[in-house]
């Protein structure tokens, strides 16, 4: 039996594909189109098994469509701006561009080893000025349309990366890249006004029939549409403050009122700005992040004012007003009324400050006389109690709408739809990102950079070891002239998620020098027919891309697309066993050996190793497998076959030596089967030979 020489075969065919430009995109008008795209990679240094799985899935689909007569667009690019390059440049004393280019060369070579059917003529890189000059144009156009604003706001500050994070980039209260505990800081920032499209983004989810339901649900919850009410509270105790308005999704619990809580940035707080106790309290608040998650986990603290709020539905019911760390100015009206019996956050606060807890929703099958709230708030459905004119109403289905009607009738409240989604903060205090095409006059006036002066490129002679933003310290770049007037450049750069919010458009017209895309190309290729990537991007990249399409289409009759991806597939993770030594430190597979077929120990020391569960491959857990080593030893077809066949592509897959060995044997069997078929075809002796070959093939499989 002849052995399959995968190195010879792979080198031969990859050479043929390159010479014949087999995967170059062509457009034949009599054929249907198929745009297949996997989420493009960050050039971190080497490809990993997640890349192998992602791009192999897309490659099989692209090849299948091409064989079925489609015009296929299957491109590749690099999401090449970002903090890791800047950090690596500092550590290795080299420029981020050098580090990035070297990594791109390495990863491109590795991807080619996989034999992917990629049109490399359309390759793009987001750190290339030929790419980001178009992004700067988009920014200016959105600024002209009123979709970009600069405003002061509390932001999520990563103290390690020393940059701002969007809410979506804070995971479990920590920075998505650095892992540092996020702090709250007030800065003047640029924002994309994504909230203008909240309802559109929500409604259009229903039209995405070829998206996973879990992704649509995640976006729906993140957008967070809620029907509530603005309620006006009369205030006692001050000649300066007569009224405070709150937003609530549960106005029906007004008779459970225990306190009012307002944000540290609420206009009322200015009356306490010279109070030492309030100053200390405000400083303490800065240690809390701005995300709902961070606020939920933080200890609830408040500053008690001298103000008293009167319940608008019962003038005899009064409650103290606090300034609290868990209320944000950019949600609702920056003020809430606390009903501790039916909101856990409010209950924690009430217990801490010994405030009243009045139950107003009775759970089903509970005795009204015996029902009490201790340390757990009741947040379920029930019947309204202890609420005078609302008593007996079913909560919340009947009681909310009834309460809103009463408040509107009395002109002390108004029904309102609110969204959880916040405007997208896009300013980042880093060097290695797309420069924002804005300059400032000496008096602070904003001037958009003329489009003829684009791109605004990054200076090459930058000091990355200075504290804070390197661009802020580069005087010859920071201070410049526009129309012979001395101006100061914006030194923040754009969030890298902006770079990836439109790259799929650039692939349609990668060589267009005048604009980011060509309408004729877009009219043929868009939307992407099949997009492939991780579910972790559901409320980041996937939501931002949907917004970006709408932002381009806004007041633009030449752009008709609102959804970038008609089909979405989210692949599972590639997992591997984890190993720890007796001190609890992660150990790699290369550092251990098996003794007596049952015990793992560290090589050399013979220290016992604890085998943990299979987890997603990561450098930090030292459970990665180098794809290039597997390709060099077993061939690209082996790794591709294993990654596709061992588990459904939407599920996690566990890497195993047994599985990859079995895949190698299968490829050998397939090779020999084909050789036998070819040989028997050449020696065809009777008319029934084709039937015999078919039976033989089935038997061999």
State where each predicted segment sits.
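Conserved oxyanion/phosphate-binding beta-strand-loop segments in alpha/beta enzyme cores
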Residues: 1-37, 66-75, 99-108, 210, ...
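Residue patterns forming the tRNA-binding/recognition surfaces of aminoacyl-tRNA synthetases
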Residues: 3, 12, 16-20, 91-246, ...
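Surface-exposed helix-capping loop/turn segments at secondary-structure junctions
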Residues: 4, 21-26, 71, 114-119, ...
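Amphipathic alpha-helical
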Residues: 14, 194-226, 257, 262-303, ...
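Short, solvent-exposed turn/loop segments enriched in Gly/Ser/Thr/Pro and often Arg
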Residues: 29-31, 40, 75-84, 123-131, ...
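Conserved active-site neighborhood of enzyme catalytic/cofactor-binding cores
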Residues: 42-73, 171-176, 280, 331-365, ...
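Catalytic alpha/beta core of large soluble enzyme barrels
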Residues: 58, 71, 266-363, 376-378
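Conserved catalytic alpha/beta cores of large enzymes that bind or transform nucleotide phosphates
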Residues: 282-306, 314-315, 355-363, 389-409, ...
